[in-house]
Amino acid sequence: MTFYLGIDVSSKTLDVAFFRAGEHTGACEQFDNSPAGAKKLLRIMARLDVQHVVLEATGGYENLILDAMAQIYTVTRIASHRGTAFVRSLGKFAKTDKADARALAHMAQTITPQPYKPPTPAQRHLRGLVKGRDQLIRQRDDNRRRIKRCESMVVQGALERVDALLTAEIKALEGLMAEAAKAADAPLAEQLLQVPGLGKIAVATLLAFLPELGQRGNRQISALVGVAPYTKQSGRRDGPRQIMAGRPFVRRILYMAALAAIRSTQSPLRAHYQALKERGKPPKVAIVACMRKLLITLNAMVRDQTPWHG
């Protein structure tokens, strides 16, 4: 008998729903979110014909069981808003861990599998560095806002020393990121560094959080990053197209890269941006269009293994 599994992940537990093919109800069991709990779940799964597993991204709490299962089973990790939307589409509004697991098992029977591919150790290390740098930059930004509002010279001096420390740590992480990017994929890192607007930080972020670069179509890669325009039409109203969702780390770095490319005389994005402005596009819309064009160019470069031509 074929089974479909839905897993609701928390920091301490895994609630797992087991649905037989064609059924929309089934048993639900709880396991510890630990190596021992993962082994226990895998022993049970080994006795079943598991066709598809769906779980939500939960900020990293899912990584243990995800990495353990992805080597053996077809596992799809979805964004949490997709799970919420699916539950509401079923007309269910109760919120429990078991109910969420059952909804995900139902979803496993419905959606086309998008098999999760675990990152390599080098990619995982690089992701940690990119996330750590981002956290320190946010802390430094908060600290600098406090400095501007500070009423005590003593406290201001203390905050300025904290600022200097954070800046030094950020610089150190950036050096480690450049080294880790080369360790993850040196040829690809060198290829991307040829592109005007892409520096070492941007390249490291792309290697860490967009391993699909060069492996997906232009529409797919645009949707993954969150720069694909979606139509907003209802009745007689035809609203402006909007971007949504995607991968924030990659989208932020693409925004900065597009701005740098627009200012560069060596980049064709400068002319593309000016042409969009002349057609009456708002500046932000023109920048997002340049982000998408830059991403599609990078996707083609990696797919075809061609250098930057300008």
Sequence positions of predicted segments:
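A short amphipathic alpha-helix within small helical-bundle interaction modules
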Residues: L136, L166, L192-L193, R216, ...
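Helix-hairpin-helix/helix-loop-helix acidic hairpins
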Residues: R144-I201, L210, I262-T265
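Acidic, carboxylate-rich catalytic segments that either coordinate divalent cations
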Residues: S264-G310
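Short alpha-helical scaffolding segments that buttress acidic/His motifs in well-ordered protein cores
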Residues: M107-A108, L126, L192, L206, ...
